[in-house]
Curated annotation (Swiss-Prot):
<dbReference type="GO" id="GO:0001907">
    <property type="term" value="P:symbiont-mediated killing of host cell"/>
</dbReference>
<dbReference type="InterPro" id="IPR036716">
    <property type="entry name" value="Pest_crys_N_sf"/>
</dbReference>
<dbReference type="InterPro" id="IPR048645">
    <property type="entry name" value="Cry1Ac-like_dom-VII"/>
</dbReference>
<keyword id="KW-0749">Sporulation</keyword>
<dbReference type="Pfam" id="PF03944">
    <property type="entry name" value="Endotoxin_C"/>
</dbReference>
<dbReference type="GO" id="GO:0005102">
    <property type="term" value="F:signaling receptor binding"/>
</dbReference>
<feature type="region of interest" description="Domain II">
    <location>
        <begin position="283"/>
        <end position="466"/>
    </location>
</feature>
<dbReference type="Pfam" id="PF03945">
    <property type="entry name" value="Endotoxin_N"/>
</dbReference>
<dbReference type="GO" id="GO:0090729">
    <property type="term" value="F:toxin activity"/>
</dbReference>
<dbReference type="InterPro" id="IPR008979">
    <property type="entry name" value="Galactose-bd-like_sf"/>
</dbReference>
<dbReference type="Pfam" id="PF21463">
    <property type="entry name" value="Cry1Ac_dom-VII"/>
</dbReference>
<dbReference type="InterPro" id="IPR001178">
    <property type="entry name" value="Pest_cryst_dom_II"/>
</dbReference>
<feature type="region of interest" description="Domain III">
    <location>
        <begin position="467"/>
        <end position="641"/>
    </location>
</feature>
<dbReference type="InterPro" id="IPR038979">
    <property type="entry name" value="Pest_crys"/>
</dbReference>
<dbReference type="InterPro" id="IPR005638">
    <property type="entry name" value="Pest_crys_dom-III"/>
</dbReference>
<comment type="similarity">
    <text>Belongs to the delta endotoxin family.</text>
</comment>
<keyword id="KW-0614">Plasmid</keyword>
Amino acid sequence: MNSGYPLANDLQGSMKNTNYKDWLAMCENNQQYGVNPAAINSSSVSTALKVAGAILKFVNPPAGTVLTVLSAVLPILWPTNTPTPERVWNDFMTNTGNLIDQTVTAYVRTDANAKMTVVKDYLDQYTTKFNTWKREPNNQSYRTAVITQFNLTSAKLRETAVYFSNLVGYELLLLPIYAQVANFNLLLIRDGLINAQEWSLARSAGDQLYNTMVQYTKEYIAHSITWYNKGLDVLRNKSNGQWITFNDYKREMTIQVLDILALFASYDPRRYPADKIDNTKLSKTEFTREIYTALVESPSSKSIAALEAALTRDVHLFTWLKRVDFWTNTIYQDLRFLSANKIGFSYTNSSAMQESGIYGSSGFGSNLTHQIQLNSNVYKTSITDTSSPSNRVTKMDFYKIDGTLASYNSNITPTPEGLRTTFFGFSTNENTPNQPTVNDYTHILSYIKTDVIDYNSNRVSFAWTHKIVDPNNQIYTDAITQVPAVKSNFLNATAKVIKGPGHTGGDLVALTSNGTLSGRMEIQCKTSIFNDPTRSYGLRIRYAANSPIVLNVSYVLQGVSRGTTISTESTFSRPNNIIPTDLKYEEFRYKDPFDAIVPMRLSSNQLITIAIQPLNMTSNNQVIIDRIEIIPITQSVLDETENQNLESEREVVNALFTNDAKDALNIGTTDYDIDQAANLVECISEELYPKEKMLLLDEVKNAKQLSQSRNVLQNGDFESATLGWTTSDNITIQEDDPIFKGHYLHMSGARDIDGTIFPTYIFQKIDESKLKPYTRYLVRGFVGSSKDVELVVSRYGEEIDAIMNVPADLNYLYPSTFDCEGSNRCETSAVPANIGNTSDMLYSCQYDTGKKHVVCQDSHQFSFTIDTGALDTNENIGVWVMFKISSPDGYASLDNLEVIEEGPIDGEALSRVKHMEKKWNDQMEAKRSETQQAYDVAKQAIDALFTNVQDEALQFDTTLAQIQYAEYLVQSIPYVYNDWLSDVPGMNYDIYVELDARVAQARYLYDTRNIIKNGDFTQGVMGWHVTGNADVQQIDGVSVLVLSNWSAGVSQNVHLQHNHGYVLRVIAKKEGPGNGYVTLMDCEENQEKLTFTSCEEGYITKTVDVFPDTDRVRIEIGETEGSFYIESIELICMNE
């Protein structure tokens, strides 16, 4: 074979030894040029294809053929018709060594073969004992034998896989063998899990085995992908690297390694339950990846990167080849060669024809000469081209599975010498690996690209997809149907195909957002033919996401649309928000049908369109879809699900407690966990498990009682309305939200009254008597949704101050469907499956002791700690727990609030709380001293206002200014109200109320004894007759009558008891020239006058005794010039 043309057969070389008789035979067969098929694919590739094909056939295995999948694989890897049993493993090593230009040493080859011989012996013993037991499953000795051999074989397979992965310098060369050993190991573990109950591996041992399977799957995939990519990097970066070698490596390692990895996820019997009649049956896996064969000159004049772009496709939705157009250079009859091509293709279940661009040269001298309609899949192709000069293509044949042949022929005349033929295809026949027949082909043609070398020479590449891919996305009636996301037939502008990580069998679909439009994908599937009117199915999604995202999942059947919303978990994170093409196995999750399901009732033989689109995505959000899975909901599936649910719910309930006696709760068990566990238990079928349900309900009720007894916060679940809490008016206790079990707290936004904000709040003080000294307490709860709600927890200050903004994103778990009996949680599958770990699932907000304030975004669970120091029941510091909303558009729904003991503190925590305690005591001492000083001054001022300690009368010379000053002193008393709430009493509230009441009494007595109405002008000029420019102004917080012009006048007529003496007292000041005056005049024209001038600085108090001769007098205020300010006017009877 010419090393420059690894896919071609040289005509001259094939004819060197022909005689005249051979030549005549060739002429009789009209064979004008050599057709000696080239073995372009190694025998190891054919072997790998047979292994994958054998496993894929177990989607619908022939009845009674084998009892375990391993039995079908072993004869392929250790064929009986070969004199050297290790031939297959030698082929794997030799082929890989050729691909990466590495020689297999005799030691490595011998050692690897020895290891695999031991593996074969263990597997043979296992399959023999398994089949013996399977035929007599009640035979105890057979059961013991198979269990023992299972354990021994599993250990040996694991040991062998680890050995191959750690053989330094040969990790890549041995990778295909490693993949096969990993495959053995996982298929074996699958047997153990399927037969766990009969082998007494149920529950704890079975769970351990399942965890082992998950861990091994993760490790086997990670190792394989790492070394596959290292091989690519080595070939890509070689200084003299050729694309043909690079492509050979990608193609053959995809078949030998990556395709095997793509099967692993389907081995999980808990995700893909084994069929009860035939437990060898597997869920169908589809390989949507494309691999390439090509005719390329060597050495090529283009780089690996350039040829990769020219001869392969960028990522795309899965397509089906429908038409090929060919251009031919037609300028000269003897130079008629292929010059370009174009492709017509369609997406799955789409009748619309899509067209590619033109590949090659279709310009001057080239004409469209062929349009080949492909109404049947092509399983083999051949190219005829010249060998010197090379790559001038004259003919191309397409072998179709319907038995017909389609051809391109440039019709060059005369026929050039030195033609050669290259065959392309994939066969499970090791003797003709690149020349499949209609009976043994594994791939179909999906695309062709032509790339120009020079005027008449071209490179040609063929893209191939595995024949396992279903053209209709047929939905099985008796097995889980997997439909890769790249088989969508519609993506909108913000949905895109991205490169797969290598272990998913193909590429993926990323749903992103530009800030306004979220990505949308649509997949069309076709239901099978069945006799029932309808059948029930559930829809599951395998995905990865970089944050919790709500998805709208819907389907359209016969014009009717149905759907729901579900939510993803956050499964991965990448720097700079790049879209990952290296997702790990463990970064994928399933949205399960029995958690949040799109229930579907489908009719026979109908097309159904399934759509997925995120809601309210930000530009940073990403959801990456691997595949959707459609699960037939049969009675056996439901029964199995009920059984699994019972076991899961038993585990959830057991996880609430610390021991089997169930007399103490785990510290991590929240009150919310207990409520949700109760919801789970209530959904257990009473028909199937009445006793189990009753026992579990009793245990959950016990857990609730234990939760309430350890909670030092009173009424944290609001089942007794607001008992124990102090609240503002706009607090309500509701029970209409299925997120919560029973009552919950609803807080509305703060009230805005004429620009003044009145916060919404609720708080509770935990008395000292309920606490323990030097102890840490957990403060936690559950937020359904909130905006701008502030949590403050305090003992020695604001130890906890958190703002919680939590979106209302749990509706998919808890649809608002109520009937007369309450929320129908069971039918809607409202309860999260992993409720025992809600802190992880719902992104618990925890306190950072290094920060004074924190903001919690998207955290439904919150959990903080607060420490106590020494206790003082007299001081009764306690612990304050408060929720507050200070913005009018804020809101919150809360429940399951608890403060529970975590345990005694020591070390640094103990030192810290003692420091805080001392600091708080020092601050309190300073506050008490400050309070005492303020109190003494205010009390002294108030005492001076009255004639006795009973505050029955004012001193005669008590003025309004003195009362106002006393009021000022009272208002200056500190710490009257709570630091966080301006209308909640603080430490000095009681003494403030006492003194404020005495000031109010003084003011009342003052107003009562003043015969003049509104003499302090607090009611403006009410009661006064005003002319000219006079009004009441607020000056330094005091109402002052101001006269600004000589023409202004203010007067009031007053009724007196004559024959009594009175005192007229005025506090006022004059500014500017002229005088200000206040005159009292009776009806006998007797008058008294108080005069003020600007020579008198500030406000002056002046009095005059008056003895009116009549019972009516007139008070008149005026000025001659300038401004006159009157603070108060009193007329007091001398008998008072």
